[in-house]
Amino acid sequence: MKRLFLLILIIIIGVSGLSAKDYYIYCTAESEDEVALIRFDGKTAHVEKRIPVGVWPVEIEGPHGITVSPDGDYWYLSMAHGIPFGYLYKYKTGTDEMVDRVELGLFPATMQISNATGLLYIVNFNLHGGHDEISTVSIVDPDEMIEIDRVETGVMPHGSRLLNNGLKHYSVAMMSGKLYEIDAMTMELKRTLSTAPKLMKMDDHSGHNMKQGKMDKMDHKMPPEKPTWVYPHPNDKLLYVVNNGTDNVVEIDIKKWSIVRTFKTDKGPYNCEVSRDGKYLVVTYKGAAKTGVWDLKTGKEVAKLNNSRKVTHGVVISPDSRYAFVSVEGIGKEPGAVEVIDLHNFKKVAVAEIGKQAGGLSFWKMEN
């Protein structure tokens, strides 16, 4: 019996050792001009490094969006506060040394690199512009750090994401209330869609790019939805759009180009992400200082967790679908934080404090 107990104990220890992983995440601190590299070992979140970013020592340049290249060799950072234009920065992972930068539009924000084209697509949010100023998506060669095109979309575009196959790019425009589809290969705007659960106007669901700018400029009435984020399902058949202004997330069938489900959320939903196994949608509630977890099969919210401070921001989920990493800005001089949620038991398991106004996150790697 004693030998059997020891054998079972050895097996348990061995299995737990094999399953232990280190998860590495980059997170911006917008009011600190820093990027934090965080390592989560399954129990504790460690701030491995605080990386100063930008080139102006006495000015806050505002690191906002961040993404890691598909090969994991570089990370890219949008610096929102330009004079007047912002920049895209390129850094080497590991050493975290700056490689290059390129000037873009007004307040560059969210970005992602296409698996199909290898190009980087980044929205120019134009936070301080007028509510009728049409902005753009910049398309950048991340190897040469050259902007090769700009595609006009709507007013205050945000939430730049691509299908997993890299062939289609999606973004939303906060003050236009619309979703935009760009062909990643041809760099052309193909379709637009109102993010309102009930389609009210003919032009809301029409899919032509030729008159898009004129149509948006003529519609001075701001839609109440104020969409802030879009994220594709791993099957590349569905999209999830966060309507910050009307407290809901809409599920969109890409082929039908229509809304098929609406999830009523807590106050001020802001970002979202779908786990790679397709089971869960994690939504940050900026206005409620909470994070929600939705079961996509049932359409029900299965967990809602209070965050450690106010102003919940972004979320990224580990590739093994085990953990959600949530950034929480904090208020004033309060440090920002990255919180770790276990998607097996829906509990918060770790918190790492970083610089002020924690914002964009990007997953780097997992190591055994």
Language-model segments: what does each one mean?
Residues 15-368:
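Predominantly soluble domains enriched in secretory-pathway, periplasmic, or organellar proteins
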Residues 4-13:
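Sec-dependent N-terminal signal peptides
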